[in-house]
């Protein structure tokens, strides 16, 4: 399989589709194992059904199923990976019936997490200069994990190879399947390639995948409305929101040293963005917006935290400016930079939620995001931040101006932002709500249950 990647250039979205098709075809060598697993799973369901009809259901109604959460991203620096790491930690600590399954350099198991070594990793064309890759898992290994863990449902956190493999395994074994709409793939494709046909193909394939699921989770109401408009049954859409660690992200983390490293002028207003450095995030437009405000005679500077394929282009754009590109940050350093800034702004149109917007507000700084986006659901316009009319440089500059010029207004918004995040559900609340939604996943096919009951009544069994 590795020779497929080594001997074939992967160019563009179509190339990725061809290679994924070839790899999935190769994986169909596992078909005999899948057929056998499906047969034994059906027999097991039948046996459970007989036992239930004669002796009663040993499982209390409303009990959530043991669930495997499959994700294509875990160790990377992005919102989905952060949520998965948090979930793995909290699942073990809170004894939640969830185990996260993620790609890793080797197969391993520990509390709350199982890592599987991919058969092969596919580089993503738009991120050739980056480490981002999609791992194709072994279906046989996933079957083993389901059997050994006693999983009763599968949840795909991402619609990539792990999610597709999870759907296939769930269907073979007759298990309920859920999926999270974690990334606006069609918008990403359009932003990265400019190819509307490719974006439409991605949209259609994603919609097809969501229609196969028993439940579809989404982080915001706006995204849920969009899925319903695409033909996804609204009755199976659930909101799986996000929490924020208000102890880690706290105004008390404000650091004189961090502030001094970013700007030596106490009167300069510091604008912060924390994001993956890629085209769709709109950071180039944010640079232009800050420059517009500065040209009007205001003391303002931009700090950029993150890494990604657009880093070289952004460094070139910043070469003769006083703005700073700080690279990736995590932990206490990131918390200190958040709390030491004056304004946060993310002019992205592709977010499904925007975890960094929550972290900025928890740190006590007002947040600017484009109107009519999932990001805007996280910010109360005029209270905890400002909804820019669009993601254009001109509209972002217009949103920045009142906060740059009025310190008291800025501080009031920051205080309101902190208070808003303090009243938000905690991560433990969010994960408990997710488990409650799992109770809506049926362990056994109701049609099969009805047929079994009729067989018993007819004296066949």
Task: Indicate where each model-derived feature is located.
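Aromatic "clamp/platform" in nucleotide-sugar-dependent glycosyltransferases that forms part
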Residues: 330, 349
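Nucleotide-sugar donor phosphate/pyrophosphate-binding loop at the beta->alpha transition
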Residues: 176-178, 186-208
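Conserved donor-binding/catalytic core segment of Leloir-type glycosyltransferases
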Residues: 69, 264-281, 287-291
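Short hydrophobic beta-strand element within catalytic cores of glycosyltransferases
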Residues: 366-370, 379
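Short alpha-helical donor nucleotide-sugar binding micro-motif in glycosyltransferases
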Residues: 210, 328-329, 336-341
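Conserved acidic donor-binding segment of nucleotide-sugar-dependent glycosyltransferases
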Residues: 226, 381-382, 386-392, 402-407
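Carbohydrate-associated surface elements
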Residues: 104, 222, 243
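A short helix/loop element that forms part of the nucleotide-sugar donor recognition site in Leloir-type
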Residues: 250-264
């Amino acid at each position: 399989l590795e020779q497929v990647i080594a001997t074939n250039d992967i160019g563009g979205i179509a190339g990725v589709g061809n290679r994924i098709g070839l790899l999935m075809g190769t994986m169909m060598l596992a078909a005999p194992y899948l057929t056998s697993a499906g047969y034994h799973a059906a027999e097991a369901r039948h046996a459970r059904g007989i036992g239930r009809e004669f002796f009663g259901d040993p499982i209390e109604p409303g009990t959530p199923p043991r669930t495997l959460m499959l994700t294509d991203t875990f160790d990377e620096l992005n919102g989905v990976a952060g949520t998965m790491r948090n979930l793995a930690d909290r699942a073990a600590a809170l004894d939640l019936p969830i185990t996260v399954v993620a790609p890793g350099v080797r197969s391993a198991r520990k509390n709350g997490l199982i890592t599987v070594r991919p058969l092969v990793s596919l580089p993503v064309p738009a991120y050739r200069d980056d480490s981002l890759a999609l791992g194709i898992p072994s279906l046989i290994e996933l079957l083993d994990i389901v059997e050994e863990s006693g999983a009763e449902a599968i949840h795909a956190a991402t619609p990539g190879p792990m999610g597709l493999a999870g759907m296939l395994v769930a269907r073979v074994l007759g298990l309920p399947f859920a999926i999270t709409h974690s990334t606006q793939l069609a918008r990403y494709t359009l932003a990265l390639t400019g190819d509307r046909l490719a974006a439409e193909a991605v949209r259609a394939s994603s919609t097809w995948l969501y229609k196969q699921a028993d439940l579809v989770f989404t982080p915001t109401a706006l995204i849920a409305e969009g899925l319903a408009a695409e033909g996804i049954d609204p009755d199976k859409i659930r909101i799986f929101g996000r929490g924020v660690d208000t102890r880690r992200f706290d105004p008390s983390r404000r650091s004189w040293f961090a502030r001094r490293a970013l700007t030596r002028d106490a009167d300069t207003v510091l604008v912060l963005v924390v994001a993956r450095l890629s085209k769709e995030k709109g950071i180039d437009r944010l640079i232009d917006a800050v420059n517009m405000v500065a040209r009007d005679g205001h003391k303002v500077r931009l700090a950029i935290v993150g890494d990604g394929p657009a880093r070289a282009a952004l460094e070139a754009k910043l070469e003769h400016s006083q703005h700073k590109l700080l690279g990736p940050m995590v932990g206490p350093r990131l918390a200190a930079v958040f709390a030491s800034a004056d304004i946060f702004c993310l002019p992205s149109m592709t977010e499904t939620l925007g975890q960094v917007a929550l972290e900025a507000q928890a740190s006590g700084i007002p947040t600017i995001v484009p109107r009519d986006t999932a990001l805007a659901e996280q910010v109360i316009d005029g209270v905890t931040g400002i909804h820019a009319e669009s993601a254009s440089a001109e509209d972002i500059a217009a949103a920045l101006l009142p906060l740059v010029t009025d310190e008291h207004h800025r501080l009031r918004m920051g205080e309101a932002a902190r208070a808003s995040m303090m009243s938000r559900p905690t991560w433990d609340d969010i994960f408990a709500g997710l488990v409650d939604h799992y109770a809506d996943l049926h362990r056994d096919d109701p049609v099969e249950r009805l047929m079994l009951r009729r067989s018993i009544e007819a004296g066949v069994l």
